[in-house]
Protein backbone atom coordinates (compact mmCIF):
# COMPACT_ATOMS: atom_id res chain seq x y z
CA UNK A 1 0.00 0.00 0.00
CA UNK A 2 1.48 3.36 -0.99
CA UNK A 3 0.77 6.66 0.65
CA UNK A 4 0.30 9.57 -1.73
CA UNK A 5 2.37 12.65 -1.04
CA UNK A 6 0.20 15.65 -0.15
CA UNK A 7 -0.10 18.25 -2.90
CA UNK A 8 1.78 21.14 -1.32
CA UNK A 9 1.82 23.13 -4.55
CA UNK A 10 -1.98 23.06 -4.70
CA UNK A 11 -1.99 24.65 -1.24
CA UNK A 12 0.48 27.29 -2.46
CA UNK A 13 -1.71 28.02 -5.49
CA UNK A 14 -4.83 28.35 -3.30
CA UNK A 15 -2.90 30.78 -1.10
CA UNK A 16 -2.04 32.91 -4.14
CA UNK A 17 -5.75 33.24 -4.97
CA UNK A 18 -6.75 34.46 -1.49
CA UNK A 19 -8.08 37.98 -1.12
CA UNK A 20 -5.69 40.53 0.39
CA UNK A 21 -7.71 40.59 3.62
CA UNK A 22 -7.43 36.82 4.03
CA UNK A 23 -3.67 36.97 3.46
CA UNK A 24 -3.44 39.73 6.06
CA UNK A 25 -5.38 37.57 8.54
CA UNK A 26 -2.85 34.76 8.06
CA UNK A 27 0.00 37.19 8.81
CA UNK A 28 -1.59 38.49 12.01
CA UNK A 29 -2.14 35.27 13.94
CA UNK A 30 0.21 34.58 16.83
CA UNK A 31 0.16 30.79 16.71
CA UNK A 32 -1.09 28.10 14.33
CA UNK A 33 -4.20 27.13 16.29
CA UNK A 34 -5.53 30.70 16.03
CA UNK A 35 -5.89 30.14 12.29
CA UNK A 36 -9.04 28.13 13.02
CA UNK A 37 -10.81 31.41 13.85
CA UNK A 38 -10.32 32.89 10.37
CA UNK A 39 -12.05 32.39 7.03
CA UNK A 40 -8.70 32.19 5.24
CA UNK A 41 -7.90 28.77 6.70
CA UNK A 42 -11.11 27.27 5.38
CA UNK A 43 -10.46 28.79 1.96
CA UNK A 44 -7.10 27.03 1.90
CA UNK A 45 -8.61 23.66 2.84
CA UNK A 46 -12.03 23.50 1.19
CA UNK A 47 -12.18 19.68 1.23
CA UNK A 48 -11.72 19.00 4.90
CA UNK A 49 -10.38 19.90 8.28
CA UNK A 50 -6.79 21.05 8.52
CA UNK A 51 -4.75 18.91 10.93
CA UNK A 52 -1.61 20.13 12.71
CA UNK A 53 0.71 19.53 9.75
CA UNK A 54 -1.46 21.64 7.47
CA UNK A 55 -1.78 24.33 10.15
CA UNK A 56 2.01 24.68 10.30
CA UNK A 57 2.09 25.24 6.54
CA UNK A 58 -0.74 27.78 6.59
CA UNK A 59 1.03 29.59 9.44
CA UNK A 60 4.14 30.07 7.24
CA UNK A 61 2.59 30.72 3.83
CA UNK A 62 2.66 34.55 4.09
CA UNK A 63 6.36 34.61 4.95
CA UNK A 64 7.79 32.67 1.98
CA UNK A 65 7.95 32.85 -1.79
CA UNK A 66 8.00 29.80 -4.05
CA UNK A 67 10.86 29.73 -6.55
CA UNK A 68 8.59 28.58 -9.39
CA UNK A 69 8.52 25.38 -11.40
CA UNK A 70 11.30 26.42 -13.80
CA UNK A 71 13.78 27.03 -10.94
CA UNK A 72 12.71 24.22 -8.61
CA UNK A 73 15.77 22.00 -9.23
CA UNK A 74 18.26 24.85 -8.75
CA UNK A 75 16.60 26.48 -5.76
CA UNK A 76 18.84 26.37 -2.65
CA UNK A 77 17.85 24.18 0.28
CA UNK A 78 16.34 25.80 3.33
CA UNK A 79 19.52 25.23 5.37
CA UNK A 80 21.55 27.13 2.79
CA UNK A 81 19.08 30.02 2.84
CA UNK A 82 19.29 30.16 6.62
CA UNK A 83 23.10 30.12 6.56
CA UNK A 84 23.28 32.75 3.80
CA UNK A 85 20.74 34.89 5.66
CA UNK A 86 23.04 35.15 8.67
CA UNK A 87 20.62 33.31 10.94
CA UNK A 88 22.27 32.73 14.30
CA UNK A 89 22.82 29.02 14.86
CA UNK A 90 21.58 29.32 18.46
CA UNK A 91 18.21 30.51 17.18
CA UNK A 92 18.07 27.49 14.89
CA UNK A 93 18.81 25.19 17.84
CA UNK A 94 16.01 26.88 19.80
CA UNK A 95 13.64 25.89 17.01
CA UNK A 96 14.97 22.32 16.96
CA UNK A 97 14.60 21.91 20.74
CA UNK A 98 11.30 23.73 21.21
CA UNK A 99 8.02 21.91 21.66
CA UNK A 100 4.87 22.63 19.70
CA UNK A 101 3.66 25.32 19.02
CA UNK A 102 6.74 27.32 20.08
CA UNK A 103 8.92 25.53 17.52
CA UNK A 104 6.90 26.72 14.53
CA UNK A 105 6.38 30.18 16.05
CA UNK A 106 10.15 30.58 16.39
CA UNK A 107 10.68 29.15 12.91
CA UNK A 108 8.27 31.72 11.49
CA UNK A 109 10.40 34.44 13.11
CA UNK A 110 13.39 33.07 11.20
CA UNK A 111 11.43 33.28 7.95
CA UNK A 112 10.47 36.87 8.78
CA UNK A 113 14.14 37.63 9.48
CA UNK A 114 15.01 36.31 6.01
CA UNK A 115 12.44 38.74 4.52
CA UNK A 116 10.30 36.50 2.31
CA UNK A 117 12.91 33.95 1.24
CA UNK A 118 12.45 32.44 -2.21
CA UNK A 119 12.51 28.70 -1.67
CA UNK A 120 11.32 25.40 -3.04
CA UNK A 121 7.91 25.41 -1.34
CA UNK A 122 7.29 21.75 -2.16
CA UNK A 123 10.50 20.71 -0.36
CA UNK A 124 10.08 23.04 2.63
CA UNK A 125 6.41 22.16 3.02
CA UNK A 126 7.34 18.48 3.14
CA UNK A 127 9.68 19.19 6.09
CA UNK A 128 7.12 21.29 7.94
CA UNK A 129 4.24 18.90 7.32
CA UNK A 130 5.89 15.86 8.93
CA UNK A 131 4.39 15.07 12.31
CA UNK A 132 5.03 12.66 15.14
CA UNK A 133 3.21 11.83 18.34
CA UNK A 134 5.15 12.27 21.55
CA UNK A 135 4.11 9.97 24.41
CA UNK A 136 4.31 12.86 26.89
CA UNK A 137 1.58 14.79 25.03
CA UNK A 138 -2.18 14.22 24.68
CA UNK A 139 -3.25 11.47 22.29
CA UNK A 140 -4.64 13.82 19.63
CA UNK A 141 -1.52 16.01 19.51
CA UNK A 142 0.85 15.63 16.59
CA UNK A 143 3.98 17.75 16.85
CA UNK A 144 6.40 18.85 14.16
CA UNK A 145 8.75 15.93 13.55
CA UNK A 146 12.06 16.08 15.41
CA UNK A 147 13.67 14.31 12.47
CA UNK A 148 12.52 17.06 10.09
CA UNK A 149 13.87 19.75 12.43
CA UNK A 150 17.21 17.92 12.66
CA UNK A 151 17.37 17.79 8.87
CA UNK A 152 17.03 21.59 8.72
CA UNK A 153 19.86 21.97 11.26
CA UNK A 154 22.07 19.51 9.32
CA UNK A 155 21.39 21.30 6.02
CA UNK A 156 22.29 24.59 7.73
CA UNK A 157 25.66 23.27 8.87
CA UNK A 158 26.41 21.58 5.55
CA UNK A 159 25.77 24.89 3.80
CA UNK A 160 27.73 26.88 6.34
CA UNK A 161 30.86 24.74 6.29
CA UNK A 162 30.93 23.46 2.71
CA UNK A 163 33.30 25.64 0.70
CA UNK A 164 32.02 27.19 -2.50
CA UNK A 165 33.49 25.93 -5.78
CA UNK A 166 36.97 27.33 -6.18
CA UNK A 167 37.49 27.92 -2.43
CA UNK A 168 40.02 25.87 -0.50
Give names to the regions the model predicted.
Residues 2, 6-60, 64-168:
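Basic, alpha-helical nucleic-acid-binding regions used in initiation and control of genome expression
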Amino acid sequence: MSVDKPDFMALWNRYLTLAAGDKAALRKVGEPDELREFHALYSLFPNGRAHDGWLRLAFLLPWCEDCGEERREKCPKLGKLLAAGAVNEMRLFQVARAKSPNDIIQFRRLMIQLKHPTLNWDEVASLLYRSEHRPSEPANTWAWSGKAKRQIVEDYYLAKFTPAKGDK
